[in-house]
């Protein structure tokens, strides 16, 4: 949403182009971007600027249109597929991360299976799943069809097991590649860096 308060319109692509011109800045990373904010202009800016990391964290939350609608999300599965497809077409080596919610009120077994298939097909590089938490004073807290806690956790575990296999395959594909990395520090008492 960068720029809306200043210019009355979204200007993140322009900001990326300007930041990329600053000497001494080597990496620019967009940390969090809702699907509806990912425009062709943003994709083109990421693709065009070598200093902009080929990385996006896109919190899709779910892939079942039924659940997305109950959540009040502004995208559906077809739009999510189109966005991910465009990103991978324009930026083939992009790293995509997402977060999901298991057991949102009204999530059926069919909704969960649809989400599972979506994750399997999209093969995200990184993925986190959180069981829905019934927060007081939120619209979802009073929705009918609350999912039992053990079902939410089971579905989370199923998705994370799938993601582990996907991540393992992706890591195997990187064996032998030389990459530029940023070291944030050394793990105490180990020869490991993070």
Regions found by a protein language model. Name each.
Residues 4-24, 70-74, 134-165:
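Radical SAM enzyme [4Fe-4S]-AdoMet core and its adjacent flexible, acidic
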